[in-house]
Swiss-Prot record:
EC number from the UniProt entry: 4.2.1.11
Organism: Helicobacter pylori (strain HPAG1)
GO molecular function, one term: magnesium ion binding
Metabolic or biological pathway, per its Swiss-Prot or TrEMBL entry: Carbohydrate degradation; glycolysis; pyruvate from D-glyceraldehyde 3-phosphate: step 4/5
Keyword Secreted belongs to the record: yes
Protein name per its UniProtKB record: Enolase
Function recorded in the entry: Catalyzes the reversible conversion of 2-phosphoglycerate (2-PG) into phosphoenolpyruvate (PEP). It is essential for the degradation of carbohydrates via glycolysis.
């Protein structure tokens, strides 16, 4: 029986220069694997708790030595000797060890690091790629990338309210061709922005962070870039938004669009989205309303839910019980999947199974604070997620995921790129 022989954690750096955890697991056959935990900038209030040191003398309070110590002591002590390939049992032991619903004791960053490293070590010991170990024989589908090519909100220091303006290359036969087309649009957009004397510095996720005067100008610029790059707007490459509305809302559920000097209530904001969807080929809107504005979400879902994908991120925080509430209320039709929002790989799988059972699309996602770790690329293929958000085709921590997906596509001898079929199954 393959068992856990040793576990340890190290404080390393993420793509924003903040500390994070690298957890390593060694198995009884001396197989070793590691995983680096990501971290978000805009976070949902119901996310699992990321444990930070709050010691202002180190990393401005953002150190993770306490979380590392939890791995190196409590977690290590209780997990050594357990069967490695029984991921669900080990993850349940981690949950019980913490004893809180949001990992407030051990830290979700400590727990997830170990959970990820264990999956990777077990796959390695069995001589299986991670996607095959997690997904079995049915892991064949390459996801449609949602490439964030203009950044705003908390991901960039500019006047754009919406956090992410994305492109989705739907009209292609392979992931490789879809990624190539997206990269050409990205570089074409840079030239267009240069020509308008706009900034082409990049945000946390590799997208450009220009100072447009309102939230529509990025849609115009991206549409121009798609056509100038030689692709059919809406047919080959569509648009998507992550509004991150929880960052814009006040206590009365009024939404402050500072870039446009507007304050809108839920119904007015939904009307604004309807105007945008009518004018531009927007196929997906994420976090269109605040995580607490459930009445607004119900209205948004009623007005646009049959027309486009409505993704809950802060709304659901990868939590099966919260998703169940959304299903019962007919809220949204898709969920963003971020393992560090919930804590372990097994809990993430539970949420995905629930979503798929109720025909909610699943979008595998990175965080704004990332690393060279490409776990989510394998995870997306393992689960036939259909979509992945992992930034632009810039910054090496984003490219690591795309390169891994290219590698997987090659291993699968092409696999299945869902492309145009994505929303036909929704």
């Amino acid at each position: 029986m393959l068992t856990i022989k040793d576990i340890h954690a190290l404080e390393v750096m993420d793509s924003r220069g903040n500390p994070t955890i690298q957890a390593s697991v060694i198995l009884s056959d001396n197989t070793k694997a590691s995983a680096i935990v990501p971290s978000g900038a805009s976070t949902g209030k119901r996310e699992a708790l990321e444990l930070r040191d709050n010691d202002k003398t180190r990393f401005l309070g953002k150190g993770v030595l306490r979380a590392c110590e939890n791995v190196n002591s409590v977690i290590k002590h209780h997990l050594i000797g357990l069967e490695a390939i029984n991921q669900a049992f080990v993850d349940e032991r981690l949950r019980a060890l913490d004893g809180t619903p949001n990992y407030a004791n051990l830290g979700a960053n400590a727990v997830l690091g170990v959970s990820m490293a264990l999956a990777r070590a077990s796959a390695k010991a069995l001589n299986l790629p991670l996607y095959r170990y997690l997904g079995g024989a049915n892991a064949l589908t390459l996801p449609v990338p949602m490439l964030n090519i203009i950044n705003g909100g908390t991901h960039a220091n500019n006047s754009i309210d919406f956090q992410e303006y994305m492109i989705m290359p739907l009209g292609f036969e392979s992931f490789r061709e879809a990624l190539r087309a997206s990269t050409e649009v990205y570089h074409t957009l840079k030239k267009l922005l240069d020509g308008k004397n706009q900034l082409t510095s990049v945000g946390d996720e590799g997208g450009f962070a220009p100072n447009f005067s309102n939230n529509v100008e990025p849609l115009e610029a991206i549409s121009q870039a798609i056509e100038k790059a030689g692709y059919k707007l809406g047919e080959e490459i569509a648009l998507a938004l992550d509004v991150a509305s929880s960052e814009l809302v006040d206590e009365n559920f009024n939404y402050h669009l500072k870039g446009e000097n507007k304050i809108l209530d839920s119904h007015e904001l939904v009307a604004y989205y309807k105007e945008l969807v009518a004018k531009y080929p927007i196929v997906s809107i994420e976090d269109g309303l605040s995580e607490d504005d459930w009445e607004g979400w119900a209205f948004l879902s009623k007005e646009l839910g049959r027309q486009i994908q409505l993704v809950g991120d802060d709304l659901f925080v990868t939590n099966a019980s919260i998703l169940q509430k959304g299903i019962e209320k007919n809220i949204a039709n898709a969920i963003l999947i971020k393992p560090n929002q919930i804590g372990t790989i097994s809990e993430t799988l539970e949420t995905i199974r629930l979503a798929k059972h109720h025909a909610y699309q699943c979008v595998m996602s990175h965080r704004s604070g990332e690393s060279e770790d490409s776990f989510i690329a394998d995870f997306a293929v393992a689960l036939n997620a259909g979509e992945i958000k992992t930034g632009s085709t810039a910054r090496s921590e984003r490219i690591a995921k795309y390169n891994r997906l290219l590698e997987i596509e090659h291993e699968l001898k092409g696999g299945i790129y869902i492309g145009k079929e994505l929303f036909k199954h929704g």
